[in-house]
Amino acid sequence: MINHGNIVGNFIVDDMGNPIATAGGGQSDIIGDYGEFKIGIEVTLSTGMKQYEMEGEPVSRHIGELQKQGPAFGIFIADKLSDTVISHFYISSIANTKVYNGRVDIIPMSTATFVEFFEKAVKKDLQPSDLYQIHEHSLRMSKQFLFEEKTEKDWHKSVISEIFNLLS
């Protein structure tokens, strides 16, 4: 996974190369350019309602702006995901917007889930097409679950399950 794209960290690092702050305004913390598509990775330490207030709109905007350049989706990482953030990202994956050239897909993951995903993805040598398949599944399920009157929790569970199905 990491070896198949051009991965750029926009975060601030110390003299040893360790991250000390997230990216400045207007950009994702990490951008993975896989040629045919990009992934914007956003990381936060915020929790609860503050997580939604601080991250909901900015993360959607960052990924939306990235999507204006071509196919893209986002991964949002937090130690503990706020239910309101999951709901916000579910809704953004349903709504077709002109301003961002379509639906803005952001997949929320807890830090523990992301670490497990990343370790297994590296071990399996996950390909860019596999990553894009996760994005396509997310968009397909958000639309399907809307019509089936399912919730953001159902969508999120389905996407995380798909991720680990690809890795098994």
Positions of PLM-derived features:
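Catalytic core segments in nucleotide and nucleic-acid processing enzymes
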Residues: 1-167
